[in-house]
Amino acid sequence: KYLLQIIMENSGFFKRIFSLVYDSLLILGIIFSLTLLLVFLNGGAPENGGIIDLLQLFVTIFSGPIFYSYFWLVNDGQTVGMQAWKIKLISEEKLTIRICLLRCAFSTFSFLFFGLGYLYIFFNEEKKSLADLATKTRIAKIN
């Protein structure tokens, strides 16, 4: 298994972005569902400054990292979007929650800065993003 991971070719920019869009739609659905639950628990009334607002903030901020970390750790380095686009996360070390969360943080910041972390793939010979380099991981094509 490890030898196969070494010889897998790294995924390019577009497969990663299409996978990201696919996963983002799923995460958006999760956020909407949890928001609906919070509104229901609050009796359907909007409340400013209460515990419901704090829970909503938590749901909005942490749904993505929890989604990605869960699938990467439990599903052999693949989210649903990654499965659809036949790519997977491979780590030089054993994949841990720390690596997953760091990767999410680097990916988020690189996206917020005009996608520079992802655009770096075009200039990197190994097709690695800045998040890949920072976390000693890579996104590889699978057959």
Predicted regions and their residues:
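Membrane-interfacial and juxtamembrane segments of integral membrane proteins
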Residues: Y2-N143
